């Protein structure tokens, strides 16, 4: 039963509960009209303290397509935050007006703090470089619809694995399924955090760290590309030096498996060449579309209105 639940970390939902969300998302994809009024009279707040295109708009589109309404902000400077209002007070006020809150915040742990002060379910739409569980639901739904299941895959995660919250969440989620192996591809400056490696070691899950995509791309069933995130760097010269470390292009795709799938949480900068977009293995635009449907399912589940 997911009604009234928060989603702060991808591990907050059991495998069975995740399957409930994916099953409903599949039904919505097949017959969206059936669900077009289930959230009538309900309000979603989108509190975005950081910039967003896909996540914010897909949350808002999800609620509107369910028949609900949306309020919120996409620039904290246009709210009372600019006057010094605390996160805790903002949440107490907004949760009194609405039925569910999606929050993105630059500070790690902000969504957890919000959940302790809210009268309504909190959905973490990204907290700093920590977690991004609804992107993980999007990634998993895409894998499920294209690969059929979540087990027995070699998954390559490439790019900014240090600050890439989507990577951290996806590794944790896929570690719950059988016989998955991770290849972590990054420069030494952007290696995945130790706590994720400890998480994998504690569960005896196989992984290796490498710094060259071309050396391992032929092994992969799933390649998850990420951009190097300019906004996480204090040293802009280091960002410039690292930003084009990995570029997936046709030449590299020629070495990959015929059924490998390429995912990317978007936005991309230079890390996937546009000449890959027409490759049947490029799944990132489908992935973005599925994000709206999985958020529709999640909202319906936590509101108990399906």
UniProtKB/Swiss-Prot annotation:
Residues given in the record as carbamoyl phosphate binding sites: 54-55, 104, 132, 135, 266-267
Residues at which L-aspartate binds: 83, 165, 227
Metabolic or biological pathway, per its Swiss-Prot or TrEMBL entry: Pyrimidine metabolism; UMP biosynthesis via de novo pathway; (S)-dihydroorotate from bicarbonate: step 2/3
GO biological process per UniProt: 'de novo' pyrimidine nucleobase biosynthetic process; 'de novo' UMP biosynthetic process; amino acid metabolic process
Keywords recorded for this protein, A-Z: Pyrimidine biosynthesis, Transferase
Enzyme Commission (EC) number: 2.1.3.2
Reaction catalyzed: carbamoyl phosphate + L-aspartate = N-carbamoyl-L-aspartate + phosphate + H(+)
Alphabetized GO MF terms: amino acid binding; aspartate carbamoyltransferase activity
NCBIfam families registered for this protein in UniProt: asp_carb_tr (TIGR00670), PRK00856.1 (NF002032)
Function: Catalyzes the condensation of carbamoyl phosphate and aspartate to form carbamoyl aspartate and inorganic phosphate, the committed step in the de novo pyrimidine nucleotide biosynthesis pathway.
Record family assignment: Belongs to the aspartate/ornithine carbamoyltransferase superfamily. ATCase family.
Assembly, per entry: Heterododecamer (2C3:3R2) of six catalytic PyrB chains organized as two trimers (C3), and six regulatory PyrI chains organized as three dimers (R2).
Name of the molecule in the record: Aspartate carbamoyltransferase catalytic subunit
Taxonomic path: Bacteria, Bacillati, Bacillota, Clostridia, Eubacteriales
